[in-house]
UniProtKB/Swiss-Prot annotation:
Its main location: cytoplasm. Pathway: Amino-acid biosynthesis; L-serine biosynthesis; L-serine from 3-phospho-D-glycerate: step 2/3; Cofactor biosynthesis; pyridoxine 5'-phosphate biosynthesis; pyridoxine 5'-phosphate from D-erythrose 4-phosphate: step 3/5. The keyword Transferase applies. Belongs to the class-V pyridoxal-phosphate-dependent aminotransferase family. SerC subfamily. One of its GO terms (molecular function) is pyridoxal phosphate binding. Keywords: Amino-acid biosynthesis, Aminotransferase, Cytoplasm, Pyridoxal phosphate, Pyridoxine biosynthesis, Serine biosynthesis, Transferase. Catalyzes the reversible conversion of 3-phosphohydroxypyruvate to phosphoserine and of 3-hydroxy-2-oxo-4-phosphonooxybutanoate to phosphohydroxythreonine. It is an enzyme of class 2 (transferase). It comes from the Bacteria. The modification N6-(pyridoxal phosphate)lysine is found at residue 190. This is Phosphoserine aminotransferase. One of its GO terms (biological process) is L-serine biosynthetic process.
């Protein structure tokens, strides 16, 4: 039976990315060695990093003066590195979910943190829009897609100060005006690669402005100067990321990824809105995520939640259980998710509806 992988992360990767990475695990570039056992300074590996950086810049139209870094530690480490490197006195944060809240918590150790707005009172079921960013803030931090709650910023915001964004779960799913940001970062295990590598796009001249001492490994300048090679980088995930970047380019680039994402999301949201048994959880439909589609049983069918989960699992659906903090269901439809799998979930929902 075909499995349909709706996991929120680590998550689905294009089949050809898995196959090419698997081949490299057995024999990298005809070297007779696995990519897991070569030196990161081997002559065959530097071109992997160089091409991955070049494709990042090409696909996202990154302006001159920015570096692309491949680091470790996940977005969770970036929550600390961001204020360490950029917060001198005051930073502004938009609180749209657990991950934004965690980022804010880390920033408070380095300076004043202004929460410009929050949707916590509504369990983060919408993205606040009525707020003012302080003009004297060092930066304005946003989380562009909220995997737990299914909300997403579909366009870059305007800000009177430089912006920083956690784009862990929607990178390469839409065009970005990178010039609005001094830093874009994320864990790669949702839309780019297997777990283990963190991507950072950083504006070079924004680094080195704070007065505090920054430990070597937490200083972006270290990694800019070292070309992501100051210490041993996550070799295998970087290689897989390169294969994904090639796949995105071969499949029409970021604009095509956005088109496909909207088509898949529209299909599933239409069924959620039509089906008598389900309802969406996001209160403002304009905020509905294309990446993580969250829904619950309507109240009169609430006692059938476990039955639907079992039914869907038997039909090959994987990873549709909602996050433990909110319950319900979540279908993560990242770039690699085929439309056929979304249709399979819709068919499953319709079949379950007919049974009840």
């Amino acid at each position: 039976m075909k499995k349909h992988n709706f996991n929120a992360g680590p998550s689905i990767l294009p089949r050809e990315v898995i196959e090419k990475t698997a081949q490299a695990v057995l024999d990298f570039n005809g070297s007779g060695l696995s990519i897991m056992e070569i030196s990161h300074r081997a002559k065959d590996f530097q071109p992997v990093v160089d091409e991955a950086v070049a494709l990042f810049k090409e696909l996202l139209n990154i302006p001159e003066g920015y570096s692309v870094l491949f680091l470790g530690g996940g977005a969770s480490l970036e929550f600390c590195m961001i204020p360490f490197n950029f917060l001198e006195k005051k930073a502004a944060y938009l609180n749209t979910g657990v991950w934004a809240k965690k980022a804010m918590k880390e920033a408070k150790a380095f300076g004043e943190v202004v929460e410009v707005a929050s949707s916590a009172e509504a369990t983060y079921t919408y993205i606040p829009k009525d707020y003012t960013v302080p003009a004297d803030a060092d930066y304005f931090h946003v989380t562009t897609n909220n995997t737990i709650y299914g909300t997403e910023l579909h366009e870059d915001l305007d800000s009177p100060v430089p912006m920083i964004a956690d784009m862990s779960s929607d990178i390469f799913s839409r065009p970005i005006d990178v010039s609005k940001y001094i830093c874009i970062y994320g864990g790669a295990q949702k839309n780019l690669a297997p777990a283990g590598v963190t991507f950072v796009i950083v504006k070079n001249d924004a680094v080195g402005k704070v007065s505090r001492y920054i430990p070597t490994m937490l200083n972006y300048q270290t990694h800019i100067d070292g070309g992501s090679m100051f210490n041993t980088p996550p070799v295998l995930p970087i290689y897989a990321a390169l294969q994904t970047l090639r796949w995105i380019k071969a499949n029409g680039g970021v604009a095509e990824m956005q088109k496909r994402a909207k088509e898949k999301a529209d299909m599933l949201y239409a069924e959620i809105d039509r089906n008598k048994m389900f309802r969406g959880t996001v209160t403002d439909k304009a905020d509905r995520s294309y990446m993580n589609i969250c829904f619950v049983m309507n109240d009169e069918y609430k006692d059938l939640e476990a039955d639907f989960l079992k039914f869907a699992t038997e039909k090959g659906m994987v990873g549709i259980k909602g996050h433990r903090s909110v319950g319900g269901f979540r279908a993560s439809c990242y770039n690699a998710m085929p439309k056929e799998s979304v249709q399979a979930l819709i068919d499953c929902m319709q079949e379950f509806e007919k049974l009840h």
